[in-house]
């Protein structure tokens, strides 16, 4: 429901105004968490996506690989938690593998190892974004 509202109230209006839209999670997160993590039927999820997206597709997707150890450290540092933060480690492993599986077969997806130092990772990501947006 919240993803539908986000698409309807934020993404679609911005795209109509020819704005660049950046989301930190989108449809692949639903597939990774619901289908591969929680075993929800993929056809069910795909049908929902067709209805709410109406052919909206990301031009560029950045996937950050993170080690199990690093993800646990990051979770411990958070001040607030959500329901996904308390799932078993196997859930996160399945989700991570599914993100990589989804990304490997698509030319507009880029996979980065998040163990790079922040500046190196940031530089690599911005280089791709600039290229995609034709910014020098």
Describe the function of each predicted region.
Residues 44-47, 60, 91:
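Residue-level recognition of specific faces of alpha-helices
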């Amino acid at each position: 429901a919240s993803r539908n509202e986000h698409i309807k109230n934020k993404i679609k209006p911005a795209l109509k105004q020819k704005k660049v839209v950046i989301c930190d999670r989108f449809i692949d997160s639903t597939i990774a968490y619901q289908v591969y993590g929680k075993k929800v039927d993929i056809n069910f999820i795909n049908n929902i996506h067709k209805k709410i997206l109406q052919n909206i597709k990301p031009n560029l997707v950045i996937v950050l690989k993170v080690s199990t150890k690093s993800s646990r450290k990051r979770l411990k540092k958070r001040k607030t938690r959500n329901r996904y933060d308390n799932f078993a480690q196997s859930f996160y492993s399945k989700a991570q593998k599914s993100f990589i599986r989804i990304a490997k077969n698509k030319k507009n997806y880029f996979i980065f190892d998040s163990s790079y130092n922040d500046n190196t990772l940031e530089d690599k990501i911005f280089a791709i974004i600039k290229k995609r947006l034709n910014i020098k």
